[in-house]
């Protein structure tokens, strides 16, 4: 994997590695492209489903620790790509595994159409990879509340609040928009009760923003991650990014204090954000 390439990267003069988000993504696929002519997987790391666990495709905690430690030995910092604006789409794989959402199919028709493992479905004659949506009852309010829950996201499904039309409340690419602006305690996402591998613990009074910044900064505290590249920065409140920066900075300082033999230097935590469509004019996103 990547760790085995560190010597080569060092020889090239690389001093920082910005890696795709290694956090757990949605499982399975959704229809890809406007025509649905291929299955689209969350290979890019932008459909995070659980901010407390690593995606199995990226390796284990030991693998990550080895990467960070070996990179630091070579003068290379590790940066995570991270997302707090949205989560991923609902997939057949996750609906079945975590018991949320509803289908129009029942009994023998369900088994005949989707089989024992729903994610094995493939489009038939006259169908595309988008056609799996035809089997899903998106209007069943109770069934879809078992997914994230209204306190966590806004989306055009079930009884969720509809997305807005501004940068902060819109549904980017029809993705569920996380309510990072909310001041209401949320509890954990509802489907996490069926997700035994999550490390998420309920914290009294925490909002979605509080959970997200806590979970992300924990990777810094546990592994010594040096920085974040923030995706979709303009779609999340600046106060949320400041909260994350503050917590991650404290976390890295704590990690360096606990691991003086592993730290690269005393440099503080570093963050940069993508504000799509922004020119070189001065603003809160560009100085």
Regions found by a protein language model. Give the residues of each.
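N-terminal structural segment of carbohydrate-active enzymes
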Residues: 1-77, 85-87, 92-95, 107, ...
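Short, acidic/polar
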Residues: 1-8, 201-222
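Loop/turn elements at helix/coil->beta-strand transitions in domains of secreted/extracellular proteins
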Residues: 10-17, 72-79, 223-228, 265-271
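Active-site-proximal helices and loops of the catalytic beta/alpha 8
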Residues: 68, 86, 101-102, 106-129, ...
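Intrinsically disordered, low-complexity regulatory segments
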Residues: 161-164
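Active-site cleft segment of glycoside hydrolase catalytic domains centered on the general acid/base Glu
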Residues: 176-205, 233-250
